[in-house]
Amino acid sequence: MPSDLPTPDAALRAVSAPEHNPLGTAGLEFVEFASREPKALGETFTKLGFKAIARHISKDVTLYRQGEMHFLINAEPDSFAERYAEEYGAGICAIGIRVANAQRAFDRAIELGAWAFEGERLGAGELLIPAIQGIGDSHIYFVDRWRGRGGQRGGLGDISIFDIDFRPIEIDTAHADLSHVGTGLVAVDHLTQTVGEGRMQEWLDFYRDLLNFREIHELHANWHVSAESRVMVSPCGAIRVPLYEEGTRRTNLMHEYLPDHPGEGVQHIALATDDIFACVEQLLANGVEFVEPPPRYYAQLDARLPGHGLDVERLKRTHVLVDGEIGADGVPLLFFQTFVRRGAGEIFFEIVQRQGHHGFGEGNLSALAQARAES
């Protein structure tokens, strides 16, 4: 079943509703990573099914592609990314948000109190992409050039930033690389962020006032947030940001599955797939390791979600957790998730699939805690 993320066409339609979407937000254009060991991070991306398809024309930045995702590894010396990696280790140092007009979006954000990011040096022929400072020393870029914006797949008047600022690694496969399937990961489902103790409201206001995000319960009335988290969603529906506040009570189990980010910033990134079982089986074949839930977790599943209709043995083999509910019509509304085993100083990845459920696995934390207690 397809994921619940809006299609590119649906995200583009949101641009034409200025009363709800004044920036013309239309999804994520890229996620930028910094690391003290960029080569090792690139190898991780390759295991996850991404392909290095282009390099920046003037900087040591590599573009990786899979599904609708663009991941950048910024290894430029004496750059913001290098300083970020020295301070925080491997992490997400910036995101690029598609908007109707980048300069207008930037100017509006500055007028509302955002701080400008002055950016790095520009090489010859390189685009100036406006950006503001985001959470935890990260940056948010506003991008108004992306493929498909004009209803086409490339061509004059429909050129992305990657057509201008990057050069293909393999000319012969450049066009095919734009549709790289990899392991079946298709999009970024959400970016979980930690905020400083006592600063939750400040960051809620940041997303609401500057970017026009809304809390998820405003969009899905039957969705209940936990006392320790809030979830913000972009006007186009394609960007989800769960927020957790530092200093709140965390169990040892949550630390294992959701390790703390050192300071404010992106704690982990969740990647969506349309078939989590096939995807994870391919990832396992690629050498990716996953956190293994206690066996008791699966023994409780029938009682917790009667009528789920799932192959429990396959869930076990792939280390997949499932949360959700059975709808009034008897149709299961499910959220699948599994966590890539994370080494010290590595990026934390989650793999998810949605079947009509808008949650983030809240029920799995209590189910895992119970399973641990009974094991």
Residue ranges of model-derived segments:
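TerminUS-proximal long segments
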Residues: 2-15, 337, 341-375
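Long compositionally biased, domain-poor regions of proteins
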Residues: 239-243, 262-341, 347-354
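Vicinal oxygen chelate
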Residues: 26-35, 82-107, 130-132, 186-197, ...
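Beta-rich nucleic-acid/ligand-interaction surfaces
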Residues: 60-61, 221-233, 297-307
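Beta-propeller domains
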Residues: 193-205, 209-242
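Acyltransferase donor/substrate-recognition loop-hinge adjacent to the catalytic core
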Residues: 140-194, 214, 238-242, 249-256
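An N-terminus-focused feature that recognizes amino-terminal "leader" regions
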Residues: 2-149, 155-173, 318-321, 337
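Conserved active-site tyrosine of GNAT-family acetyltransferases
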Residues: 41-46, 109, 206-208, 283, ...
